Amino acid sequence: VKIMLEKLRISLIFINLVLLKSLSLNRRMHNLYTKFVRILEICKQFSNNLVNDQGNIVRCGPVPKFSDLEVVALSLAAESESIDSEKWLFDYKLQEYKEQIPNLISRRQFNDRRKKTAGLCEAIRKRIALKMDGGEDFFLVDSKPVEVCRLARGKRCKMGQTGDFSKAPDFGYCASQNTYYFGYKLHAVCGLSGVVHSYDLSKASVHDLNYMKDIKLEYHNCSIYGDKGYIGADVQLDLFETAHIRLECPSYQVYILFVLMA
């Protein structure tokens, strides 16, 4: 425990230094196009064997002028600017950069291709996370509520009723906020430096313990710490025997350090 606390303390110091450096660099990334270009460069560095020389996923048909990597980069750049409206993004924001992005596709094409490149985006994200935080032996798992509508409107919400019911939102309870909500539950596993390595969505009513059943497919020879909702004797034994994963509930002091770091 002493070794782990010391490692957490050092990591907190390192994160503060990185954060200060990032804030100083962000002054130069003052517009959407600058972020788009920078993110595109990063995507190219981590897309080896994922796309061809033109930056597209190999497939039949005409070669798009606006590459798949550019679709991913534009999507991430918009997220970094907290832009959640595609209409506003294409009708207003991107009009400023018509000359810089001559091959820009339409909003409908962007919407369709962003769905098709979701797997590419996730693969690049995992490679970046591994590069930033690849040698970790300690991880933290936690969840947070994702509310899709107000509790009173939950029974009238039609989301997910026409498809797979297991993926539809549901009523759930958040113990940390002591409140009920309607929506999903976001589970995430991060390392000591705060880098998210994996995540998943579940119905709000699904117990946290169910998320740990599939985690052995991605992790091995490590320690994972979570609150009591993720701890179960059967799951702990299974994870240790199959993947040498030590699943534990940390002391309050260690848990607070994890939360501050993330």
In which residue ranges do the predicted regions lie?
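Short alpha-helical elements
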Residues: 2-262
